[in-house]
């Protein structure tokens, strides 16, 4: 059944790029079955849709919904869970002690807070979504978001390297025997099987949920947390799915910048370019510690990191230093 709504406000911002010409005084927006049909003055539009339900009394501001392009869907911040902020590399260990809340709760809180703040589209970028538990939580989170009515991009994220620390293979050899045995599973595991499981989950989520309003993206968690073999498979999967978007954290801290130079012998973005991962369907979260030549390369390739700087997280993690 077709449903038509008229959103009525004192002002309707239709295109902020146009300045005053993009604002309609006494404006309204007509929506039919979830799609914007037209904009104009309420006085002109209302008589043309006599059966439409009107929301707003002419005193509100109407504006396009905001987009959160990089969120982890926690619902509560680490501080709210009892873990204070620190430098990123320290925080990764501290976060292991945060309570793990059920995904139906965290996704619901996240959706509610976003909608209340004017965000109508949310990107949930997962973190360590490997194993059966990761798959279970992904399905529940997506269903919860969709039930809330928010538009969604969802990217299951994993790391096949640097799960313990950057350069974990070198670190293992410096540890005493008892710690070495405890740390080995984080460094030495079947990476081919790990990747197979990840792409199986991605295909499952994509085939189940991807549509015009919900997008499933690929997400190596971090550029420095992915092997070259894994990233090549990510590129191949994106191509096989018609150019699906790829989202990853990039150069979030000075340590990551130094590690990339040492590991690859070149800036990280140039290494990613060798793998075909600087492209118009690749988005980077943060990308704080990039060089001028890397920025120029991203611009030439059409990569989208300038839009996803996650400034509050950057400041909280002291990553700007």
For each feature predicted by the language model, list its residue ranges.
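A structural motif
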Residues: 119, 150, 243, 302-303
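Alpha-helical scaffold segments that flank or form the walls of functional sites
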Residues: 80-151, 196-211
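Histidine/acidic-residue-rich catalytic or RNA/ligand-binding cores of hydrolases
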Residues: 78-81, 164-167, 230, 254-266, ...
